[in-house]
Amino acid sequence: MATLLQIGSGVIYSNALRKTLRRPQSSTCIIVTETTPCNKSPTVQRRSANYQPSRWDHHHLLSVENKFAKDKRVRERDLLKEKVRKMLNDEQKTYLDQLEFIDDLQKLGVSYHFEAEIDNILTSSYKKDRTNIQESDLHATALEFRLFRQHGFNVSEDVFDVFMENCGKFDRDDIYGLISLYEASYLSTKLDKNLQIFIRPFATQQLRDFVDTHSNEDFGSCDMVEIVVQALDMPYYWQMRRLSTRWYIDVYGKRQNYKNLVVVEFAKIDFNIVQAIHQEELKNVSSWWMETGLGKQLYFARDRIVENYFWTIGQIQEPQYGYVRQTMTKINALLTTIDDIYDIYGTLEELQLFTVAFENWDINRLDELPEYMRLCFLVIYNEVNSIACEILRTKNINVIPFLKKSWTDVSKAYLVEAKWYKSGHKPNLEEYMQNARISISSPTIFVHFYCVFSDQLSIQVLETLSQHQQNVVRCSSSVFRLANDLVTSPDELARGDVCKSIQCYMSETGASEDKARSHVRQMINDLWDEMNYEKMAHSSSILHHDFMETVINLARMSQCMYQYGDGHGSPEKAKIVDRVMSLLFNPIPLD
């Protein structure tokens, strides 16, 4: 393996870099003049997405410093952590107080410090008789239901039957109960009927009515309207965890009657400390990206190293996983680059050569590629082999066959879409989704993620991931694709691209665009039900529950990135720049 790594360095790398296309004066051109090994004609017409350059300056990134995360703050955080631990284990707390405390710790982003304690509390509670709480309090019942299901416990939706019997007599002023009921409904599985058909629509309508009634009122010191609007905008269970934490810290700090000053101070300091760690990681991957030369040389591709790092925070935010985040940022950036080669720039003949290169995985055949592809393939080759070398060294498993196959699979899926576009083929929705689950790139991401994240690698797991046999991966990939399609398909069709899920459904059924979009949104709901089912059945799965959670987190992250537009292609228009600033560059002020 060392030989493979050595081959992809030195002279070959330098020659590839020098031969790669130079940046033209404008990145919005449609006609590019060049001569390549596969095309002797001096003029090749190519598409352009007109992507804007990165708005993040590398040298500015290197200068970022978090003054709130000094050693003094780390010591202060650790002292507060022990105080919070004592509060969590306080036997004088009522059961509801304990559930609410756990919920606050999770929403404030500090529950990772107390995973063992929280798991013990919930496991013990799950085994006890809980009929008293079920009969008396909607908020308590719904909160318990959500926390149990979030942690993979199999709780029946029947706990809500006692409330449904008097559905018309619900206390509409019980806003806490309604919010808890609404949030609990998003933990439904494909086996549940009442949660989706009755409970969620009812709770949603009550919350909308509450907003309409109180939007111009001062509803107490803690702005309940803001909390309800946030929930309606995106249910907590679907939200990117780190972003939700940043919002909740501010909301929690507004409380007057029931906020815990120790907890909120602990959460603020911890947020800033973790942010400082993330900043250092971002500096490292930004430097790597500059060294590859890809952002400069492949002018037509999205230069999005900061956004690619942002994706990894959504998948796994805890400070101890810095190597995982940095490695996966590199994979994300390389996938973004080849996606744009297939979608925008390459001719069909060139793309076929590129796909063969991934199949062969042979650096000695580099010169068979068009000049602009050589550097890209070489960087991918080097990075993947480097990852495999580290895994062989630390975990004693050769993962090159699995990593290589994941790149071959995604390149073949990209090529299928290029052929569809070239031929004018319009797939039906099922045909489209079978390919799109792979072309969205998440199966490739998950194979690499599993290799660098898991302490103990299983060949059986690698084989099922490589063969696309894990249903939770299929569901997460589908949510990723559909969330992307809902906001990017108009721009992609305008520049010339294959039909997306919305257009496939319209063509297949004759539905209007509005109905097609509604159908896609329902597909996302159904996919979440399937993922929730897989999570509750994790005890019979060969996937470790921690890895399964990162798979689900990618679905959350995709809905964050595409909530208001194409957050990866046009981050400023989609509010992603503001979100990146809040998580990576703006520390929380401390009193």
Swiss-Prot record:
Induction (record text): By methyl jasmonate. Also induced in response to the caterpillar P.xylostella or P.rapae feeding.
UniProt-recorded Gene Ontology molecular function terms: (E)-beta-ocimene synthase activity; magnesium ion binding; myrcene synthase activity; terpene synthase activity; tricyclene synthase activity
Binding site for (2E)-geranyl diphosphate: 302, 339, 343, 481, 484
Required cofactor(s): Mg(2+); Mn(2+)
Cofactor note: Binds 3 Mg(2+) or Mn(2+) ions per subunit.
Motif (DDXXD motif): 339-343
Chain positions recorded as Mg(2+) 2 binding sites: 339, 343
Subcellular location: Plastid, Chloroplast stroma
GO terms under cellular component: chloroplast stroma
Residues binding Mg(2+) 1, per UniProt: 339, 343
GO term, biological process aspect, one: diterpenoid biosynthetic process
EC numbers on record: 4.2.3.105, 4.2.3.106, 4.2.3.15
Domain of life from the UniProt record: Eukaryota
Enzyme's top EC category: lyase
SUPFAM superfamilies for the chain: Terpenoid cyclases/Protein prenyltransferases, Terpenoid synthases
Reaction equations catalysed: (2E)-geranyl diphosphate = beta-myrcene + diphosphate; (2E)-geranyl diphosphate = tricyclene + diphosphate; (2E)-geranyl diphosphate = (E)-beta-ocimene + diphosphate
Main location: plastid
Annotated residues for binding of Mg(2+) 3: 484, 488, 492
Domain description: The Asp-Asp-Xaa-Xaa-Asp/Glu (DDXXD/E) motif is important for the catalytic activity, presumably through binding to Mg(2+).
Physiological role: Involved in monoterpene (C10) biosynthesis. The major product is beta-myrcene (56%) followed by (E)-beta-ocimene (20%) and minor amounts (less than 5%) of the cyclic monoterpene (-)-limonene, (+)-limonene, 2-carene and tricyclene.
Name by which UniProt lists this protein: Tricyclene synthase, chloroplastic
Record lineage: Eukaryota, Viridiplantae, Streptophyta, Embryophyta, Tracheophyta
Annotated gene: TPS10
